[in-house]
């Protein structure tokens, strides 16, 4: 007779695709082991099931979060499964707690197996979120906000930077002394000429190796030059003294050995289309109070031979061009440098700023550098090989360009770099190891190759990004530049935030280096807190084969957020679907909580329906929690149809599509557990045993559990031991826990038809772990 039952069961499933809508009682020795194994293998929709798979789609992850913030400040920590700041985000809160400078936040939380990173947020007293995307590695997450000197809690790439300084090359007294005997320049002179007693070069200065000249008082418009060292000079110094204005109306070129010195009160005026050209070992020095102005250009060609150009006064002209060969040019600015454009192509050239630079554009190739120790404002393109932002410095640009490899940025503490337009992050941006830097960008430029590159933003940098456009795709080829930053670019302790929300303060000082400054606004971030919802989908025919649409009972459970030292647990259970036509109940067994630690178990919404279903059922004890045994077992309902108002033999299928009855209002049960002693939130993966049950012929109910709990019972009964052994060998399942709201199959739709990737996952449960996000067709699933 048992063989005939087996044949009928197999035939009905494989040949006629009839649906099993009720269970027979759990019988001992229902089939012999080989026949039972054959039935299981033939009827389950997946063959060659992963023998090591446990059918779980979540796992426990340990998070360690350290905060080195303000002394005495407690910072809320919130861990999300997605970007919580995105307007389109459906990020769910996985864990929350508090951290400060002396106490880290350590918690065990549940994460979907498909989740490869989490978003750790540190919230300040204004309600502003600093977010750090952290990869899950070896089931751990380690996040660090800020860093104290000598701290061992954060792993940070150490970078030591320095903005070169330069003392004023001359004192006022020294220049005053030199101009006292300097020779006044005459029109047409070549200052490098040799002595000639029969010409204009018959003055003693033309015999000297180091020659000092000066511009006459008042105005001087004549042209002169330095032709080189052929006349015996090895240094030519030209002073533009106080009260003198040298007007350059065409090209004035000085070769090899000329230093142009503009004294306090002296002035050079370069008219439109005119140029001051310094070649090879020639360079300029502008003393405090001196100036070079006009609509013309300054050109430094073929290097300054190791001499530093120095400005402590005012340079306000059209262009500063540094080109040609040589070993590079250092241009030191301690005053004010105003340019329409700065162009540098000589390899090794460095623009070093300790004053104020305002430019229409800065265009340096990838072998030139900018080192900013004070304030820079570039209206348009800002391009360079390497940029160093010194301590307490500020730079603003319209566009942050890209011009090849090694065009990196190093930011020291209390530095701000702002790009009001597009900024290339196809580079390494390295922040401080002590203190914080702020990188403000409107839009990250979509540079070809960025997403595949090893570019990064690392260490203690806050990235304040205006355009947070995201593809919301995990596939790297579909990422936006902001996706790249979030999923790959931010490393170590680098964070991002919404505009105006950075935990960073640098007040403006009109007389100092910080002109714009920064202080966050007072409006908190608008972050919606959504708790995680896990779906439990059951087949009711255990231990016999089913139809495997996994909709006989579907529960959506809103979970408490993972945390430590809690004395109250709240679970919100939605009965989404009843795809069975027999009486089914459901319960919750919580591992790790002994009944002796329970103060009360109360029920909010749905309590009346629960009570009615239990009083009319023999499946569960009619109590808040069962008295048998030491484990905490909470009956959720004794009859799934009863809570929806169906009585007696009225048992329609509910909410499973096709010919089932649709539900307009989903039954919800709130379960509130109050404990005597605080505990950590129980793990969904390891501790929450949601199960369904039906009444067999004996006294005990038959229970249907998730695979990881299928050898345990919550005061009911399981299959016979020999049946359990066959189930263990075949490794099929009657229950699934999906770490999201599950769009479950419609009635009579086998799960492999609803989800094409389900079979691939079942074959190897280390792959296709997000199969539940990809239904084959919307008409094959029910989604709420």
For the regions a language model picked out, list residue spans one by one.
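Acidic/polar, low-complexity intrinsically disordered N-terminal segments immediately downstream
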Residues: 24-203, 492-544
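Beta-strand elements of well-folded, non-transmembrane domains
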Residues: 559-563, 575-581, 592-594
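A eukaryote-biased signal for long
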Residues: 624-784
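Extracellular beta-strand-rich, repetitive "passenger/adhesive" scaffolds
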Residues: 163-500
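Short, well-ordered beta-strand segments enriched in hydrophobic/aromatic residues
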Residues: 63, 557, 568-577
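C-terminal motif of bacterial Sec signal peptides marking the signal peptidase cleavage site
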Residues: 19-22
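Bacterial N-terminal signal peptides that target proteins for export
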Residues: 1-10
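Extended low-complexity, serine/threonine- and proline-enriched intrinsically disordered segments
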Residues: 73-87, 580-624, 686-697
């Amino acid at each position: 007779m048992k063989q005939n039952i087996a044949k009928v069961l197999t035939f009905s499933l494989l040949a006629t695709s009839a649906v099993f809508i009720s269970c027979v009682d759990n019988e001992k020795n229902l089939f012999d082991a080989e026949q039972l194994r054959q039935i299981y293998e033939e009827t389950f929709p997946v063959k060659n099931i992963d023998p090591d798979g446990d059918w779980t789609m979540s796992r426990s992850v340990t998070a360690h979060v350290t905060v080195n913030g303000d002394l005495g400040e407690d910072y809320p920590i919130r861990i999300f499964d997605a970007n919580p700041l995105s307007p389109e985000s459906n990020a769910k809160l996985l864990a929350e707690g508090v951290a400060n400078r002396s106490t880290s936040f350590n918690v065990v939380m549940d994460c979907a197996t498909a989740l490869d990173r989490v978003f750790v947020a540190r919230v300040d007293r204004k309600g502003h979120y600093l977010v750090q995307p952290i990869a899950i590695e070896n089931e751990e997450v380690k996040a660090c906000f800020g860093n104290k000197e000598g701290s061992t809690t954060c792993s940070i790439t150490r970078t030591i930077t320095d903005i070169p300084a330069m003392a004023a090359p001359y004192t006022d007294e020294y220049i005053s002394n030199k101009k006292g005997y300097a020779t006044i320049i005459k029109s047409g002179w070549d200052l490098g000429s040799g002595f000639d007693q029969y010409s204009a070069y018959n003055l003693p200065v033309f015999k000297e190796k180091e020659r000092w000249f000066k511009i006459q008082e008042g105005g001087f418009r004549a042209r002169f030059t330095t032709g080189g060292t052929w006349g015996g000079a090895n240094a030519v110094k030209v002073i533009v003294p106080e009260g003198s204005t040298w007007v350059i109306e065409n090209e004035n070129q000085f070769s090899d050995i000329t230093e142009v010195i503009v004294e306090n009160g002296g002035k050079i005026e370069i008219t439109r289309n005119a140029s001051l050209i310094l070649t090879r070992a020639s360079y300029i020095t502008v003393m405090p109070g001196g100036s070079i102005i006009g609509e013309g250009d300054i050109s430094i060609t073929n290097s300054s031979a190791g001499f530093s150009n120095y400005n402590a006064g005012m340079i306000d002209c059209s262009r500063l061009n540094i080109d040609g060969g040589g070993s590079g040019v250092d241009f030191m600015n301690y005053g004010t440098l105003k340019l329409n454009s700065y162009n540098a192509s000589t390899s090794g050239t460095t623009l070093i700023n300790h004053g104020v630079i305002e430019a229409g554009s800065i265009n340096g190739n990838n072998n030139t550098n900018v080192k900013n120790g004070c304030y820079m404002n570039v209206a348009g393109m800002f391009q360079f090989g390497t940029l160093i932002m010194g301590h307490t410095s500020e730079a603003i640009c319209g566009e942050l360009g890209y011009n090849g490899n090694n065009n990196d940025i190093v930011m020291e503490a209390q530095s701000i770099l702002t790009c009001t337009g597009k900024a290339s992050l196809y580079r390494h941006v390295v922040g401080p190891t002590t203190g914080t830097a702020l990188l403000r960008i409107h839009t990250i430029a979509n540079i070809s190759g960025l997403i595949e590159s090893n570019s990064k933003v690392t260490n203690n940098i806050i990235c304040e990004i205006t355009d947070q456009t995201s593809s919301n795709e995990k596939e790297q080829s579909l990422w936006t530049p902001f996706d790249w930053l979030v999923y790959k670019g931010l490393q170590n302790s680098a964070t991002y935030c919404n505009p105006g929300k950075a935990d960073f303060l640098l007040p403006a000082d009109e007389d100092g280096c910080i002109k714009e400054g920064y202080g966050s606004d007072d409006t908190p971030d608008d972050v919606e807190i959504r708790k995680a919802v896990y779906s439990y989908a059951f087949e009711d025919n255990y231990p016999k084969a089913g139809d495997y649409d996994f909709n006989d009972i579907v529960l959506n459970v809103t979970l408490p957020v993972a945390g430590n030292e809690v004395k109250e647990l709240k679970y919100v259970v939605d009965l989404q679907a009843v795809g069975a036509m027999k009486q089914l109940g459901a319960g919750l067994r919580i591992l790790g909580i002994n009944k002796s630690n329970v103060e009360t178990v109360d029920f909010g919404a749905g309590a009346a329906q629960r009570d009615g279903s239990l009083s009319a059922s023999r499946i569960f004890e009619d109590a808040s929690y069962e008295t048998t045994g030491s484990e905490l077992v909470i009956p959720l309902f004794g009859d799934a149809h009863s809570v929806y108002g169906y009585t007696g033999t009225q048992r329609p299928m509910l909410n499973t599509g096709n010919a089932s009855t649709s539900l307009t209002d989903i039954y919800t049960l709130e379960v509130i557990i109050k404990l005597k002693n605080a505990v950590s939130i129980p793990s969904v993966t390891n501790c929450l045993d949601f199960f369904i049950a039906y009444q067999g012929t004996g006294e005990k109910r038959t229970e249907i559990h998730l695979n990881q709990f299928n050898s345990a019972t919550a005061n009911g009964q399981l299959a016979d031991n020999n049946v359990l052994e066959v189930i263990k060998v075949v490794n099929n399942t009657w229950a699934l826990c999906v770490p999201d709201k599950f769009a479950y199959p419609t009635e009579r739709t086998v799960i492999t038809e609803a989800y094409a990737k389900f079979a691939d996952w079942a074959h190897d449960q280390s792959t296709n772990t997000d199969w539940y996000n990809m239904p084959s067709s919307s008409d094959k699933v029910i989604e709420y």
